[in-house]
Amino acid sequence: MKIVLAYSGGLDTTVSIRWLKETFKAEIITVTVDVGQKDDFKKIEERAYIAGASKHYTIDAVRQFANNYIAYAIKLNGLYEGVYPLSTALARPLIAEKVVEVAKKEGAEAVAHGSTSKGNDQVRFDLAVKALYPDVKIIAPARIWNMTREDEIKYAKEKGIPIKVESDKYSIDENLWGRSIEGDIISDPSLEVPEDAFEWTKQIYNKKEIVSIEFSNGVPTAVNGEKMELNKLVDFLNLKFGSHGFGRVEHIENRVVGFKSREVYEVPAALGLIYAHIDLEKTIYTPMELRFKRHIDQLWSDLVYQGLWFEPLRETLHKVADEMNKWISGEAKVEVSNGSFRIVGRESEYSPYSEKIASYNKGWYPSDEMARGFIEIWGMHSLIARRVRGL
């Protein structure tokens, strides 16, 4: 039997290699997908072999993640419950896709992952695999063995397995779009998140900085006039915005699996780019377009968070987003300082904004007759309803 395991190099999946091998008497093939995490992939490969893998794949998917996933998170202002930029959720279907590709290539009977029965990731991974490879068996060791973190460490030591324990306190998941932090006192929502939990958003600079971001068809293409590939641009802004202490998200999140959790993320580039994109949309879209766009933004964010990347509606929303973002080209100027972020200017050739019309100091004014007629018609529904109801 061959089992292909989605392998991060962390504690859960490292222990899974030996457990799967011994439990199923199987050959274990590990797959690590590079989606922008700052890991030593050579060491991860070595750890996989020592733990018992017969073959290991390291797959570079950074550009694909940026161009096919992050680009749409920007075009569709992907913020789950208005705050979380979907950093972890967004990467899962791509990782699953690469694992399935290896499983098909190797003729594996099963694929495995390290998600627990409490997490959203089990839903995302399982549904992605079912969509891409319906006949393959899915194994989630952590859903079967119910070992605690301490149990896993003990098991690894007993088996002589080298493990990477990211921190005595925290469990970290990281990719190009963000960093999530769990563990220690974070699960108590009444307590402040300790400063030592953060890595990307430690404030280095005390002076404010103005940053110009250029967009073309809804996707950022340049920073301060310098053209960049999207993955490089995101990486650059993670450092730029994070060094000013900006990009922390802490909130109570409604999980897919039926309960609320306290979640903490570092997402400096993600938040900054989405905020800038939203501002350009407000500058360019008509009121009706803007209302419609906000509706599909929320719908898309919910689909991605809930593990429904392969839902047909998500593909339709991408087509709508491509069409609507044809007009979202221009420049947003942002100020970042001391953990804060604000838009300080914007311009676009597609903006209907007219200073001549909008200014109170000069230019066009409607006549008194025009204003009175507009107000009368605008309020007619409400005024007549009040009259007939005797209000």
Curated annotation (Swiss-Prot):
Quaternary structure and interacting proteins, as annotated: Homotetramer.
Main subcellular localisation: cytoplasm
EC number(s) recorded for this UniProt protein: 6.3.4.5
Binding positions (L-citrulline): 84, 120, 124, 171, 180, 253, 265
One cellular-component annotation, GO: cytoplasm
Source domain of life: Archaea
Protein's organism: Saccharolobus solfataricus (strain ATCC 35092 / DSM 1617 / JCM 11322 / P2) (Sulfolobus solfataricus)
A GO BP annotation: urea cycle
GO molecular function: argininosuccinate synthase activity; ATP binding
Catalysed reaction equations from the record: L-citrulline + L-aspartate + ATP = 2-(N(omega)-L-arginino)succinate + AMP + diphosphate + H(+)
Localisation per UniProt entry: Cytoplasm
Pathway: Amino-acid biosynthesis; L-arginine biosynthesis; L-arginine from L-ornithine and carbamoyl phosphate: step 2/3
Protein name: Argininosuccinate synthase
Family: Belongs to the argininosuccinate synthase family. Type 1 subfamily.
Keywords, sorted A to Z: Amino-acid biosynthesis, Arginine biosynthesis, ATP-binding, Cytoplasm, Ligase, Nucleotide-binding
Binding residue positions for L-aspartate: 116, 120-121
UniProt-listed Pfam families: Arginosuc_syn_C, Arginosuc_synth
Binding locations of ATP: 6-14, 114
